[in-house]
């Protein structure tokens, strides 16, 4: 099936319309425990000559409670995933993932742990083998406490080498993670971009990262 990735329907507004268009699954979010505006505008840049986009949205969303209410009021007619992440100003990022798991475990068909957005400072530190293992063990323990069987998926960055990929896959397998999403946007060098906006800070997507992703 072809699905709609997180980032399009951030606030669970149109997932059923997307199902009616023929998408096999839809992933809403990224959702944080508390509502947040994200980064100041402008924060999306279209690079026409490069067939690319740069975004620095910064997890703008209405917060877990509001999005839970929306999903409960509009029963999904297809496979609905929820992509979760921490609030920008949180002092406990793992705790934020756990709070989101508690909120969505009984209404999502799967939950994606987003550790790969380049627009939340140091979020990609969770690509470290020890830190990722700690996060996933806590998530799995909370699943047991909740008596939940919701599948857990992890979304990774394209800016990792083969050695890192192997380590991450080992951690995912050891923690019974159901799937891996490849990939988020890239914060790699922009030297070859033609558009004058190519210098903008944020995650690069589109043709320039096709091979990398």
Q: Model-predicted segments: where are they?
A:
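Non-catalytic positions within long, well-ordered alpha-helices that form the structural scaffold/packing
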Residues: 18-19, 104-105, 173
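Metal-dependent enolase-superfamily TIM-barrel catalytic cores that perform enediolate-based chemistry
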Residues: 96-144, 157
